[in-house]
């Protein structure tokens, strides 16, 4: 099929709009995390005890929806901020629906894993989202059979692949490997779901 003269500029405009939208959405989310951490610091991190995730606690299941928004301290937020911006932006380039699906699956996967198999105590932090978005970016190209997405996954793996050790219990140390594992599983699930939807079209 021949392309009309207006199609290429329209494609470039769409890509530019997605890039701007990605920076706005992901940047706003990370800014929200810092704002919450500032408030939490003023409150002596009392929010963690209220909205942090407590494994296998019947009254704490709803905390699945809040625990990624909280962190132990400023350094904890900083450690998650940059990968969230990078991975979130790259996912958003595929569109808002793809981004929301990947985030939702990573968020729920991370939370449910902690709630079901967490070691105890209170878990907070958005690292499960980091692992989920990273896993999504690693596998989606193979489901979509997209060479550029596969190439991107190889580059990301070479640059950030070492973080995958965070899903191994004995290596993860004091961080929640359950959140990392659940988030990564959610990211893979998102790639499967989105591929299935595309196949039905």
List each language-model region with its residue ranges.
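A detector for small-residue-rich transmembrane helices and their helix-helix packing motifs
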Residues: 2-201
